[in-house]
Amino acid sequence: MRRILIATSNPGKLRDFAGAAAPHGIEIAGIPNFASLLPVVEDGLTFEENARKKAEEYSRHAPGEVVVADDSGLEVDALNGAPGVHSARYAVDQPHLANENTDDEANNARVLRELRKIPPEKRTGRFVCVLAAARDGQILATFRGTAEGVILDSPRGINGFGYDPLFCFPQIQKTFAELTAEEKARYSHRGAAFRQFLEWCEGLA
């Protein structure tokens, strides 16, 4: 069984990856002693920049292993693409707090506050996920997945994390927080990016 290391301490992201990888016989694991490593400052202007930066750095701590780093977030059209790369810390969004994530409830509250006068038909947006795969400090490939949806005016669902309770996927009229792990792997931005990664893995030495 092939093992892939994921450069995150976010249990929600690890669950998402594990759910997508399980049907392919791939083991998902975190980087050993990840919590003791110095965090990589996520100061890139794009998801791609942040994902590549994290993959390069964290892969140096797992010699010979393929390490995948994820940078993802929510882009709301009515907010000119915000929260974007600031999704995890949107409630504070100060440059000197580049690695200080705020809690999901506070981030969701800010999005709802900023959309309070926006009509439903203009509350469109998307989740974006960029994965970067690296080994021994060298980028091997990057993958981008998106999921288009609508931002609700109140949260729904108890699964997931982040902005999942606000993000309604029109094709099935459920928020990402109402999906099973299997459904989320099928429909989500992270699932889309990870499927590209799995296809690439088939030719990996």
Where are these regions (language model features)?
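Anionic-ligand binding patches
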Residues: 2-5, 11-205
